[in-house]
């Protein structure tokens, strides 16, 4: 979509934080989001960066800065977006905030769901569980800042259990 804005590029810091939270979940035996069994240190696999998922996440961060929802600006489902090679994601996390633009803030906001997940409070937990789930092996993120939105900063993470071999120049 055409709009004025800026993308954050702190990829390594965001990926490191996601992997830190994954390690914490595995080393502390938190419930596996897939089957409810306790995670173990052997379940820990570092999340890898996917350029294809980053491609999707950058578009979705800009789109969702306007929609404030898991839907595209044309009203279609967020999972209908595909890379030029036809790949899509298996899960999407979004976050909005009104302070400085960076990728790690979104990761920290999703991490804040941990207590609701561990204590089964009924609160939102899907963003946190997407980060720690062993079935998600690849991630791409985009963080977009624009003064034309309700919140200045929007972060999007796209997750998948499989990678694609596409490369992109951002």
For the regions a protein language model found, what residue spans apply to each?
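Short, well-ordered surface patches within globular domains
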Residues: 1-85, 128, 134-139
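A well-ordered secondary-structure block
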Residues: 77-169
């Amino acid at each position: 979509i055409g709009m004025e804005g800026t993308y954050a590029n702190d990829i390594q810091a965001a990926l490191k934080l996601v992997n830190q939270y994954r390690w914490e979940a595995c080393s502390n035996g938190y419930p596996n989001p897939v089957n409810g069994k306790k995670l173990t240190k052997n379940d820990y696999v570092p999340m890898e960066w996917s350029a294809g998922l980053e491609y999707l996440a950058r578009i979705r961060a800009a789109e969702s800065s306007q929609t404030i929802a898991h839907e595209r600006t044309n009203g279609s489902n967020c999972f209908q977006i595909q890379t030029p090679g036809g790949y899509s994601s298996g899960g999407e996390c979004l976050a909005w905030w009104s302070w400085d633009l960076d990728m790690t803030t979104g990761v920290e906001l999703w991490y804040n769901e941990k207590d609701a997940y561990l204590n089964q409070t009924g609160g939102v937990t899907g963003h946190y569980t997407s980060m720690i789930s062993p079935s998600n092996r690849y991630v791409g993120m985009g963080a977009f800042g624009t003064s034309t939105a309700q919140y200045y900063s929007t972060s999007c993470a796209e997750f998948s259990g499989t990678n694609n071999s596409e490369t992109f120049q951002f």
